[in-house]
Amino acid sequence: MSTQTRVRHFLADDDLTPAQQREVLELASELKQHPYSRKTYDGPQSVAVLFDKTSTRTRFSFDAGISQLGGHAIVVDSGKSQMGKGETFQDTGAVLSRFVSTIVWRTGSHQNLLDMAETATVPIVNALSDDLHPCQILADLQTCIEHLCPQEGVPGLKGLKAVYLGDGDNNMANSYMIGFATAGLDITIIAPKKFQPKQEFVDRAEKRASETGAIVSVTADISAVSDADVVITDTWVSMGMENDGIDRRTPFLPYQVNDEVMALAKKSAIFLHCLPAYRGSEVAASVIDGPQSVVFDEAENRLHAQKALLVWLMENQPR
């Protein structure tokens, strides 16, 4: 949160306390049942939706969600604006705050978000950065509740075991550690030693876990999938890494989520993937297209979780 402008932003998974995260998730469930029950942006008010990176699910889910909340999304791709082309992100944040009620930004460097938050007087939502993808985690938690503990709701997440296989040094792994620990889920990152999370993000996850009782662990041992309730993977080549010259396929081949890996988890386990997925690489077609896969429920929940986040931010700004 920017101490200079006293605005509550959502730039990282640990910007929400466990109690606040629960409020957002409970609201997400309510909005899924009653999509048009809130008109937070009635007027209509406008929301800036900025993209430095290409998007499908993020763009459609925010655009549709803002419309359902009574607002108007102004969607701008970075190539069609002056952002980052001489004007500072601090200046951009100050100016956009005069035009819109919220700023949603999918960017590269996480520092871009921090810079804009210094001066923005409206909430900023991280729609993805190189470090974190916190909106995706809210959708994933909503999906876990629906499939694993619908009666208990958010409290039912505590003590469940989630495992993430593949590239542990990316934004998804970082957010899974912090966001799942916030909800009380045990989370294990299973990755080759060369591709394990940076200590900074492990420390942040462990700090949150100390509040919720969750267990955060990192290993290269695939047997850690044993008895998992949730099995997760992500693409082995994140956006912007396609031409970095690093072989990202060979080290990850043993970490593909296939039928043998799923057999280690509980029979009731669900499979998550934020998409897009590459069948035959990080996940076998038999898994992502199989009965344990809930990836399309997960994708839909981007809409509901993000709507809930926008409503919560607008209703919980410091007075």
Curated annotation (Swiss-Prot):
Transmembrane segments: none annotated. Pfam families: OTCace (PF00185), OTCace_N (PF02729). L-ornithine binds at N171, D234, S238, M239. The keyword Amino-acid biosynthesis applies. Carbamoyl phosphate binds at S55, T56, R57, T58, Q82, R106, H133, P134, C135, Q136, C274, L275, R302. Its EC number is 2.1.3.3. It is found in: Cytoplasm. GO terms for molecular function: amino acid binding; ornithine carbamoyltransferase activity. Keywords: Amino-acid biosynthesis, Arginine biosynthesis, Cytoplasm, Transferase. SUPFAM superfamilies: Aspartate/ornithine carbamoyltransferase. It comes from the Bacteria. Belongs to the aspartate/ornithine carbamoyltransferase superfamily. OTCase family. This is Ornithine carbamoyltransferase.
